[in-house]
Amino acid sequence: MTQVRGAARRTELFDALVDLLLAEGFAQLTLDDLAARLHCSKRTLYGLAGSREQLVRAVVVHFFRGATERVEAAVRAVDGPAAQVAAYLHAVARELAPASTAFFDDVAGFPPAAEVYERNTRAAARRVQQLVDAGVAAGAFRAVHAAFVGDVVSTVMVRIQQRGVAEATGLPDARAYEALSDLLLHGLRA
């Protein structure tokens, strides 16, 4: 029972850290700040990770793991290739919507967190390519070079992740994913 309670407390702390870091970023927050805000000890935080840097990376991993589960659930909830591509990209946008500019700027400026975001961006681009491949095979999308579409989507996703789209257009990441979804779906339909 203690292990279950410990795992639940660990998840609760990671969820609270995700909420805090998404809202405020993390560059300015010390372990003392985090412990005070979460009403726990620094020792408790060190139980989650060995250093502040490792904790930030672990929180970013936790965020993307949960986001991936919810995004895939959104895809499973709909039928048809166009609906699945739309569900995927709209769910990504929903997951990123709570994240502040400070969070994205801090992730971009902290290599361990940037690597996690980049890895998840690559996985998302591969997933979109799989959905497009399935749509072309089913005749729901016109015959396009799915690898090219995947590469274009990947390039845009990387630019979103690296803050290039926000700098060039002023669009927050979540809105940029919405715009990518609209562009992609209107370009693919037969």
Give residue ranges: language-model regions.
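All-alpha amphipathic helical-bundle segments outside canonical DNA-binding/catalytic cores
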Residues: 82-83, 119-120, 136-154, 171-175, ...
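Generic detection of well-ordered alpha-helical segments
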Residues: 7, 11, 15, 19, ...
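Short hydrophobic/aromatic patch on the recognition helix
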Residues: 39-49
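C-terminal peripheral helix-coil segments that are non-catalytic and often amphipathic
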Residues: 87, 94, 125-138, 162, ...
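Hydrophobic alpha-helical connector segments
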Residues: 58, 69-98, 149-153, 177
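Basic, helix-initiating cap at the start of DNA-binding domains
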Residues: 1-24, 28-37, 53-57
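Amphipathic alpha-helical segments enriched in hydrophobic/aromatic and basic residues
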Residues: 21, 30-31, 42, 52, ...
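Short secondary-structure transition hinges
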Residues: 90-130, 137, 166
